[in-house]
Amino acid sequence: MRPNDRTPAQSRPVTITRQFTAHAEGSVLVEFGETKVLCTASFTEGVPRFLKGKGQGWVTAEYGMLPRSTHSRMDREAARGKQSGRTQEIQRLIGRSLRAAVDMKALGENTIVIDCDVIQADGGTRTAAITGACVALVDALNWARGKGILKNNPLKFLIAAVSVGIYKGEPICDLEYIEDSEAETDMNVVMTETGKMIEIQGTAEGEPFSHEELLSLLELAKHGIREIVDVQKAALS
């Protein structure tokens, strides 16, 4: 039995609120249960030096957690003078995932920077960030098309992500913090709207997991992401 009385395959309620802030070309508040992440997409003309003259764009991401997004206050990373390895890993994951969804040639020599700030954390912050960032990205691309900066839509498909894991011997979908902290296996899965894999991050925190359990977890993720994509589409409609 899960602490929240959800069934093994049941995700938390997902809410996506667009145009959450006034200034960014795309902005979204995404909520996976009690996990809340603000995702903004900033569109700028020009690309990093390593891409100049290549006729293609760039999408990158930054990620951070507010000091009191967790149960006890943590120092801002700026105050510590450097980002943690976890932060660097997560923002690279977000950037990689979003780049998979964009035709960089169609983007032209333009850059989109995604900022994901965790307001409240209850497990699954990186998967919520990817899900919300995708919608913010869509809005930023639509803004650029509306301004005549882009002729064609560079978006190839929507992407979303969810966590899965083995908790008390049972594969489950969309772990909240209490489950994540006690899980024997923890996995984050990023997929396209058609169910193709973009990234799988999986670790046996306790007992090693079997091939059969891996397949079961991926099926749970596919089911969960399908439902999350439906929420994205409803938000964008």
UniProtKB/Swiss-Prot annotation:
It catalyses: tRNA(n+1) + phosphate = tRNA(n) + a ribonucleoside 5'-diphosphate. InterPro entries: ExoRNase_PH_dom1, ExoRNase_PH_dom2, ExoRNase_PH_dom2_sf, PNPase/RNase_PH_dom_sf, Ribosomal_Su5_D2-typ_SF, RNase_PH, RNase_PH_bac-type, RNase_PH_CS. Phosphate binds at R86, G124, T125, R126. It is an enzyme of class 2 (transferase). GO terms for biological process: rRNA catabolic process; rRNA processing; tRNA processing. It comes from the Bacteria. CDD domains: RNase_PH_bact (cd11362). Keywords: Nucleotidyltransferase, RNA-binding, rRNA processing, Transferase, tRNA processing, tRNA-binding. Phosphorolytic 3'-5' exoribonuclease that plays an important role in tRNA 3'-end maturation. Removes nucleotide residues following the 3'-CCA terminus of tRNAs; can also add nucleotides to the ends of RNA molecules by using nucleoside diphosphates as substrates, but this may not be physiologically important. Probably plays a role in initiation of 16S rRNA degradation (leading to ribosome degradation) during starvation. Belongs to the RNase PH family. NCBIfam families: RNasePH. This is Ribonuclease PH. It comes from Shewanella woodyi (strain ATCC 51908 / MS32). The lineage of its organism: Bacteria, Pseudomonadati, Pseudomonadota, Gammaproteobacteria, Alteromonadales.
